[in-house]
Amino acid sequence: MAREIKDIKEFVELARRSDIKSAIVKVNAKVNANGKKFKQTKFKVRGSRYQYTLVVNDASKAKKLQQSLPPTLKITNL
């Protein structure tokens, strides 16, 4: 089962739980309505029951969030 998280603070709290062992960071190239390219970053963490996903469209926020993930997580970049 999957759950989408909208709040960054809630996602960071989830990532610090004891049952969360791994994270996946996926960067997609997207085009907005004006035809301008941007990078969409998806953060996925696997819990015991759900896979939680956070979608970030701002590259600077995504970089800060990736640095704030706990060092105990096994992070895979796609």
Swiss-Prot record:
Molecular function GO terms recorded: structural constituent of ribosome
Family: Belongs to the eukaryotic ribosomal protein eL38 family.
Role, per record: Component of the ribosome, a large ribonucleoprotein complex responsible for the synthesis of proteins in the cell. The small ribosomal subunit (SSU) binds messenger RNAs (mRNAs) and translates the encoded message by selecting cognate aminoacyl-transfer RNA (tRNA) molecules. The large subunit (LSU) contains the ribosomal catalytic site termed the peptidyl transferase center (PTC), which catalyzes the formation of peptide bonds, thereby polymerizing the amino acids delivered by tRNAs into a polypeptide chain.
Superkingdom of origin: Eukaryota
Keywords, sorted A to Z: Cytoplasm, Ribonucleoprotein, Ribosomal protein
Organism, scientific name: Candida albicans (strain SC5314 / ATCC MYA-2876)
Listed name of the protein: Large ribosomal subunit protein eL38
Gene encoding the protein: RPL38
InterPro entries: Ribosomal_eL38, Ribosomal_eL38_sf
Subunit organization: Component of the large ribosomal subunit. Mature ribosomes consist of a small (40S) and a large (60S) subunit. The 40S subunit contains about 32 different proteins and 1 molecule of RNA (18S). The 60S subunit contains 45 different proteins and 3 molecules of RNA (25S, 5.8S and 5S).
Gene Ontology annotations for the cellular component aspect, listed alphabetically: cytosolic large ribosomal subunit; hyphal cell wall; yeast-form cell wall
Gene3D superfamilies: 3.30.720.90
GO biological process: protein-RNA complex assembly; translation
Localization terms from the record: Cytoplasm
